[in-house]
């Protein structure tokens, strides 16, 4: 009976603690061919209401910018830098600087030059997400995007 009580307690603690894990950003990926040797990789962040992630282009001394890191491959080469749409920008009194961010949804794009008919674009995105009262620690999310 004592073992059963302990097991039940641990199950309840597990359910309660998992309910407190915040994941306000979900990521989706796809690749779109634009020619026989070129493609655009699209990396979409869907952001919960009230939360935001930061632009790739922030001055040092502010919050953590979003960063894309692509694994080297013989199957493709990056063509330029990862692009983003125009962010919302405001002056932050705490940081004493302009801060650029995205709410709701944002699609980042990376052009690639293909060296083979198919490829897998692998890498990670590092981002920080905040709402009006808190920021979560920067998080790494790995991805692998097939290009067919």
What is each of the regions a protein language model found here?
Residues 1-5:
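Positively charged n-region of N-terminal signal peptides that target proteins for export
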Residues 7-9, 38-39:
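N-terminal hydrophobic alpha-helix used for membrane targeting or insertion
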Residues 10-18:
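Hydrophobic h-region of N-terminal signal peptides that target proteins for export
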Residues 18-148:
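Extracellular/lumen-exposed scaffold segments
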């Amino acid at each position: 009976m004592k073992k059963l009580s302990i097991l039940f307690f641990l199950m309840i603690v597990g359910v309660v603690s998992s309910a407190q894990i915040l994941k306000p950003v979900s990521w989706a990926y796809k690749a779109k061919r634009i020619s026989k040797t070129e493609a655009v990789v699209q990396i979409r962040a869907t952001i919960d209401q009230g939360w935001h992630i930061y632009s790739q282009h922030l001055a040092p001394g502010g919050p953590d910018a979003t960063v894309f890191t692509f694994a080297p491959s013989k199957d493709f080469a990056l063509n330029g830098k990862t692009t983003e749409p125009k962010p919302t920008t405001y002056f932050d009194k705490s940081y004493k600087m302009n801060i650029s961010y995205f709410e709701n949804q944002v699609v980042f794009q990376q052009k690639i030059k293909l060296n083979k008919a198919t490829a897998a674009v692998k890498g990670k995105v590092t981002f920080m997400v905040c709402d009006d009262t808190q920021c979560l620690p920067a998080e790494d999310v790995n991805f692998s995007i097939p290009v067919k």
